[in-house]
UniProtKB/Swiss-Prot annotation:
Belongs to the eukaryotic/archaeal RNase P protein component 2 family. One of its GO terms (biological process) is rRNA processing. This is Ribonuclease P/MRP protein subunit POP5. Component of ribonuclease P, a protein complex that generates mature tRNA molecules by cleaving their 5'-ends. Also a component of the MRP ribonuclease complex, which cleaves pre-rRNA sequences. The modification Phosphoserine is found at S154. Keywords: Nucleus, Phosphoprotein, RNA-binding, rRNA processing, tRNA processing. GO terms for cellular component: multimeric ribonuclease P complex; nucleolar ribonuclease P complex; nucleolus; nucleoplasm; ribonuclease MRP complex. Gene3D superfamilies: Ribonuclease P, Pop5 subunit. GO terms for molecular function: ribonuclease P activity; ribonuclease P RNA binding. The last C-terminal 19 amino acids are not required for complex association and RNase activity. It is found in: Nucleus, Nucleolus.
Length: 163
């Protein structure tokens, strides 16, 4: 039996228009990335990346996207992402770009990176707060995320101890 190795690209869709994120759909995003790969790398790139390519996770509120592709051709996908300058959906065209946050071998490593990334973003927001109410809400969010991570780690340790 052969194991197919994949790479996961954790990306952030950055746009000034909030309607851009809300109109996200995984099929539209998948076809946009495939078309961009075909435009940049030609038929070879389109054929090589079409096997095993998928949008594994999409969060329309935060703009986080997880793309899966074959390990041998992830650099073709990665190099085509800067050429995406707009998102076209339902007759509207929104200017945007992709910011690649992390490239990982498993979804789990991308999740761990995303937790750390979100924690850093919350700390930056905490430093830029002007209102005390905002500051308390962000501190609660940071504390909650730390507590959830500690519970996960203790749950993993308990599962290992039972084995």
């Amino acid at each position: 039996m052969v194991r197919f190795k994949h790479r996961y690209l954790l990306c952030e869709l950055v746009s000034d228009d909030p309607r851009c994120r809300l109109s996200l759909d995984d099929r539209v995003l998948s076809s946009l990335v495939r078309d961009t790969i075909a435009r940049v790398h030609g038929t070879f790139g389109a054929a090589a990346c079409s096997i095993g390519f998928a949008v594994r996770y999409l969060n329309a509120y935060t703009g986080i996207v997880l793309l899966r592709c074959r390990k041998e051709f992830y650099q073709l996908v990665w190099s085509a992402l800067p050429f995406i300058t707009y998102l076209e959906n339902k007759g509207h065209r929104y200017p945007c770009f992709f910011n690649t946050l992390h490239v990982g071998g498993t979804i789990r490593t991308c999740q761990k990176f995303l937790i750390q990334y979100n924690r850093r973003q919350l700390l930056i927001l905490l430093q830029n707060c002007t209102d005390e109410g905002e500051r308390e809400a962000i501190q609660k969010s940071v504390t909650r995320s730390c507590l959830l991570e500690e519970e996960e780690e203790s749950g993993e340790e308990a599962a290992e101890a039972m084995e």
